[in-house]
């Protein structure tokens, strides 16, 4: 995985004063949230979907039913853009068109890979569950068979913050 910002496919941030370059801070944002939005490419059209996820320090994982539009799109084109943001709000102004968004955001690019290895699939599901609960679960084979686990191998990350 590349270091943040410097090799982002969309280039550097225009506002360098808002860029997050500290990888520890970027990872903290990723770990602190539970929901991310993933953008997929469906032919010539974008497709955006929110998913619950987990982060193992190098990759993101989410789960899904084995069928559906998201799965079909990933099978055709596994390029993914993802967005995770925290500390949302707005900064008021006395001037029209001068209100601003308060946030800390990570946007990344990656490749979506279907996890086929049973041990990795269970590890990923354990990470996702641990993100929401302290309970430990067993996964009946029927549940594992009907659940797709997708790993996003991160290619680039870019962090930005404002008003926080």
Please tell me what each predicted stretch does:
Residues 38, 80-84:
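Short conserved beta-strand and strand-loop elements enriched in small hydrophobics
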Residues 33-66:
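Short beta-strand segments
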Residues 18, 27, 69-72, 82:
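Anion-coordinating catalytic cores for phosphoryl-, nucleotidyl-, and glycosidic chemistry
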Residues 1-17, 87-164:
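Charged, gly/pro-rich active-site loop segments
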Residues 31, 75-80, 127-134:
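Short, intrinsically disordered, mixed-charge
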Residues 60-80:
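Compact nucleic-acid interaction/catalytic patches
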Residues 52-54, 75, 153:
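Well-ordered beta-strand positions
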Residues 9-37:
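Short, basic/aromatic recognition patches
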């Amino acid at each position: 995985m590349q270091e943040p910002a410097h090799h982002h496919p969309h280039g550097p941030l225009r506002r360098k004063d808002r860029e997050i370059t500290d990888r520890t801070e970027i990872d903290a944002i990723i770990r602190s949230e539970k929901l991310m939005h993933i953008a997929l490419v469906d032919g010539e059209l974008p497709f955006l979907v929110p998913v619950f996820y987990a982060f193992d320090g190098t990759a993101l994982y989410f789960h899904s039913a084995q069928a559906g539009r998201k799965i079909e799109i990933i099978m055709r084109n596994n390029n993914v853009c993802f967005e995770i943001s925290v500390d949302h709000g707005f900064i008021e102004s006395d001037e029209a068109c001068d209100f601003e968004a308060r946030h800390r955001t990570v946007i990344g690019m990656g490749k979506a890979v279907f996890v086929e290895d049973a041990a990795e699939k269970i590890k990923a599901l354990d990470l996702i569950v641990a993100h929401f609960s302290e309970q430990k679960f067993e996964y009946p084979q029927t549940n594992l068979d009907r659940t797709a686990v997708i790993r996003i191998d991160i290619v680039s990350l870019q962090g930005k913050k404002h008003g926080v």
